[in-house]
Each structure stands twice: as C-alpha cells, then as structure tokens.
A protein has these predicted regions:
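Noncatalytic partner-interaction/assembly domains of nucleic-acid and motor enzyme complexes
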Residues: 1-124
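Active-site phosphate-binding and catalytic loops of NTP-dependent enzymes
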Residues: 70-74, 164-169
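Extended, charged alpha-helical coiled-coil/arm scaffolds that mediate oligomerization and mechanical coupling
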Residues: 97-163, 167
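Conserved small/polar residues in nucleotide/adenosyl-binding loops
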Residues: 180-181
C-alpha cells in the first residue's frame, strides 16, 4: 500500500518523479550571496556545508570557487569571483557575469544565511537518505538467502547518511575548553 502525501495528494512513488528531489534553490543562492558579501560567512559556511550539499551544479561550482579563493587568501567580491571563475574556465558554466551580479543583489541574504544553510544541508541529507533507501530497496529485492548480510549493508548505508551529523556534534577537548573558558 502506498502512502499519500497530504500536501500534494501524490503517492510516495509518484512524488519523486513529479516533484523531484528535495532542494531549495533560493536558499542555496542566498547562502552564496552571503558568502560574497562577508568573508566571515565563507569561513563559517565551510564548517556547515560541503560542495555536494548544493543541488544545482552551478551553485556547487560557485561555492567551491569561493572556498578555494578564501583558502588561497584571494579577496572575495563579485569582480574577483568573476575573474577567478573566468581563469578556471567556469564563468559561462555558472551563468556568466549576470548571475554573479544577480547574487550580489541579494543584500538581505546576510540576515538569515545560517537558516538558509541549514535548509541546504537538510535537503542534501534528505537526498542522501533517498539515495540510500533506493540502494537498500535494490539490495532487498536481490537479496541472497542470508538476509543478515543485507541488513548489515542497509545499516551501513543509513549510518553513512547520518555520520556527518554525528561528527559535527562532537568537539575535541581543546574545542570544549576554549568554548567554556572564554
């Protein structure tokens, strides 16, 4: 029996094909705009997000470029980003100068960028979970007679999805001491 999605009225099976994978392009764009406007955001965003968290390939490319620029101590602004993307032959692939300048126009992005980053991360995690469950489905349908192996593989795939969240909640002793002695 397939369950209905209360919002869309679609079955679970139909939802993926009709609505696509979880993603929020506006949240992605706002995070990138905030990174363009503040070097502090670039530093913090690297802790919160990875390139694969971005659904749109152009957003992944822009994010990676800004992180590379930051790590190379290249100042991040629209002109420098356009120049950097041009130098690595990716400017046209991300929509050209027009898209970078469009991002710069989102000046309110600094206000809620952390919330938007959380949305990007949440949707990424949901996509990972969907991928893992699809793999688990395939394993179950092609299961050997020993189901223990299938269950272990399924557990492994689900744990892989949550591993990053668990890791990010742990702090080293030094981090803990710095946090509570300041």
């Amino acid at each position: 029996m397939a369950y209905d999605d209360r919002e869309t009225g679609l079955t679970v099976e139909d939802r993926g094909s009709k609505l696509g994978l979880p993603q929020n392009q506006d949240a992605e764009a706002n995070v990138l705009a905030a990174m363009l406007l503040s070097p502090d955001v670039v530093e913090e965003a690297q802790v919160e997000l990875q390139p694969d968290d971005f659904y749109r390939p152009i957003h992944k490319t822009i994010y990676t470029a800004m992180v590379d620029m930051y790590n190379s101590r290249i100042p991040i602004d629209s002109i420098s980003l356009i120049d950097y993307l041009r130098s690595i032959n990716k400017l046209d692939a991300v929509g050209g100068e027009a898209y970078i300048l469009e991002l710069m126009g989102q000046t309110l992005s600094l206000v809620n960028w952390q919330h938007h980053a959380a949305i990007v991360r949440r949707d990424s995690m949901l996509r990972e979970l969907i991928g893992a469950t699809n793999e688990i489905n395939a394993l179950a349908y092609n299961a050997p007679t020993d189901t223990k192996e299938v269950v272990e593989l399924a557990e492994s795939k689900l744990l892989k999805v949550t591993a990053r969240e668990v890791k990010s909640s742990y702090k080293t002793l030094t981090e803990f001491c710095l946090l509570y002695t300041s």
